[in-house]
Curated annotation (Swiss-Prot):
Isomerase recorded as keyword: no
The protein's name in its UniProt record: Probable lysosomal cobalamin transporter
A GO MF label: cobalamin binding
Similarity comment: Belongs to the LIMR family. LMBRD1 subfamily.
Compartments, as annotated in UniProt: Lysosome membrane
GO BP annotation list: protein localization to vacuole
Membrane topology recorded in Swiss-Prot or TrEMBL: Multi-pass membrane protein
Pfam families per record: LMBR1
Species the sequence originates in: Nematostella vectensis (Starlet sea anemone)
Keywords: Cobalamin, Cobalt, Glycoprotein, Lysosome, Membrane, Transmembrane, Transmembrane helix, Transport
Job of this protein: Probable lysosomal cobalamin transporter. Required to export cobalamin from lysosomes allowing its conversion to cofactors.
Classification via InterPro entries: LMBD1_LysCbl_Transport, LMBR1-like_membr_prot
GO cellular component entries: lysosomal membrane; vacuolar membrane
Location, primary (coarse class): membrane
Amino acid sequence: MTIPHEVLAQGWIPFTVVVVLAILFSWFYIRYYQDHSQSEVSSTITGIIALFIALMTTALVPVDIFLVSYMKNDDGSWKPWSANRMNRDDIEETAVATTYYILYALLAFFVFVIIPFMYFFFEERDEDITTAERACGALKYSIGFLIVASVLLLVGAFAPLKQPPKNVTEWDKRLIFLKDELKSNNGETALSLLIGFLTLIGMLIMITYTAYGMTALPFSLLKGFKSAKTEQESVTRRRSRNQEQARLIKAQYMGGRAMSSRDRRRLSELEKEEHALATRERRLEAAQLGWLNKCLKLLRPFEMVFGAFFLLVALLIFVSLFITCLDKALHSNGYQYGYSLPTPQLPNPINIIMVYAQIVFPLDYCLFLLVVLYFVYSSMAGIRRVGIRCCWIKLFKVRPRRTLPQALLFMCVMLMLIVLSLNVMLFSLAPQYVMYGSQNYRANSTVTSLVNHTGIIQNVTTSHGIAKVCSMEMSSDHCTMTRIAVFLNRFFYKVWFFGACYYWGTWLFLVVFMTGLIYSIVRKRKTVVDEEYDSSDDSDEEMVTA
């Protein structure tokens, strides 16, 4: 039986809408942050396409979940069109899996080839150098990234990874779900290792930026800005004190006596501080008269509402991740299997919400996208506050309409890796939903009763099917796992090191989240010009060459 058209329409039409929204979102984000005075069309287009591809890898996940959920009825029976195993494979192993492969391959191509080339291509810009010479120079520096990608692909293709048992009787009951899913070619294993390496880097970026941004974002909205008028009065008083100190120092040397080195140094410090305070005072005066300050006053109630909402979402995510990590610590298969969780035992709030939301299509799709956008927005909040750093050395600043093309490409790579690692994070955030959606299976139940008709007691046994929630303990004949879950579980089985790193990385993410929460609570409020005042410090070029 062929797949009904309404199934394909309900699964792929929302995905098409998301594709359009992702293009608009990527274009707006890149254009909002780039410095228009120094931008190049090539770097702008590269950033937009790169961010779009990263968003697509995550946007495909709810389509994957919808298709496997729609294969079954609520009572756990297969629908007529999905009762045939070949039809199910045509959807999951052909259409969905191929789309995943294409998107992941494009993402790796951009990370290792296109973006490094465009970065060095911009660095080679000079009036005396032709475009061909710039391209040759950029290609020379980009070869190193291509070598790293090639090595990872070769290792993934030919390294002796963990193999499944040859004898069916040797299969552990906990791994029965993988019995039919471990058949993969060398090409898929090579791509998995390459993506796993990128995902691991993305996890480190999430721990550094996203965990902090999830607390910094809501508290910045809840606290708001200091009063520009009050801050200006404080700056004016500081200027008066500094001017008085400078006058007293100069008065000591009115007779032409040589100024001591101590007083000369102190006077120089006062003059520098006077210049900075004068600049700040002018900006505070302009802020009081500007339309932005007036709009912020009008929007203040909405800021507090959104701040409270974002804080609740952050706490809900924290609780869900903590419960899943605790569940894995108690009931997982251990580090040798990447801490895979056969059946979630502890109630996970986000998992419960997403499973029940799938009843009203496409409510779960909308909630899923909101969670993804919240992670992206929180990541950007962390990147803006921390800056782009390497080994704690600040390389670039990310500022609206003032971000250099090099920083923009760096930011795109960071967001791509964050979104890529978000697929693994979502697997911990809502494990049941990401693996099986709302699928049930029919479990045979035997009921024995005692019947007495003629004074003789007889045992009467009846059997019927009971709908139970799908779990890893069931084979693919009873439940169909999403492709994203198959990829992750298969990869964790073959290379347990990555699964263990993701598990302990999630714990570290929670620790950084709590640290950022405490810091955001005790941190003082900023003024409306603090971001602009910070942008007047050393330029990005000076930071890189320092």
